[in-house]
């Protein structure tokens, strides 16, 4: 299904900087466990930029869909170097995976 396809995308494009499992380590980017419904810039123990702390959004399907298209446009000053996923279908699949994989 969508989440299976999303896992492949995550493995190819996100895994080098992010973990998803509860209690997973921060890498270059924060651990994403508990992502959905969390305010942005709130993973405990991760050093965020002021830009990431100041946007004031809550992560959910729509905000992730917009963010993942072009992270630097959505949050100017973010240190996430990922250029974004322009393909809408890939973003839907990735978000489906994240929704499953980041549940606590």
Curated annotation (Swiss-Prot):
Q: Which InterPro entries match?
A: Cyt_c-like_dom, Cyt_c-like_dom_sf, Cyt_c_1A/1B
Processing and modification events after translation = Binds 1 heme c group covalently per subunit.
PROSITE patterns in alphabetical order: CYTC (PS51007)
User: Which keywords does UniProt give here?
Assistant: Electron transport, Heme, Iron, Metal-binding, Mitochondrion, Respiratory chain, Transport
Q: What does this protein do?
A: Electron carrier protein. The oxidized form of the cytochrome c heme group can accept an electron from the heme group of the cytochrome c1 subunit of cytochrome reductase. Cytochrome c then transfers this electron to the cytochrome oxidase complex, the final protein carrier in the mitochondrial electron-transport chain.
Q: What other remark does the UniProt record contain for this protein?
A: The amidation states of residues 16, 21, 52, 70, and 90 were assigned by homology with other cytochromes c.
In the record, the note on similarity to other proteins reads: Belongs to the cytochrome c family.
Name of the molecule in the record: Cytochrome c
List the lineage, top down: Eukaryota, Metazoa, Spiralia, Lophotrochozoa, Mollusca
